[in-house]
Amino acid sequence: MTIVLLDNRGFASIGGLSEAVGSGGFGTRYQYRNAATSELDGDALPVDLAANAASLGARVWRADTLASFREALAEARSEVRPSVIVVPVDREARVGGYDSWWDVPVPEVSTRREVQAAREAYDAARRMERDFL
């Protein structure tokens, strides 16, 4: 079994969704609490997912180029134990939009303008929903 682990230093996918609905991606980055602000916007936490995988018995490669990824994948194919290829990725990179909508409810009441705007967009999108059953 080969696992390709995309390391974005947090939970980037759910963070992007959280930001899209006005919640700012709370708690989706591996960061220390800032002593001055008490927010989770301090230095990066040193989470080593490769070391974690190795501690569980996996053979691990770190691939930061396409060439090193291809090499790791070729080696992993002949490995008899679980294999993990860790690929650091840009957590801010996003895929383009698409012509569909994911019904993720947004709070109806909030003091934050970002959430209020996201709720207005949510309500407008809900009005355009089509039932298929």
Tell me what each language-model feature is.
Residues 1-133:
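Thiamine diphosphate
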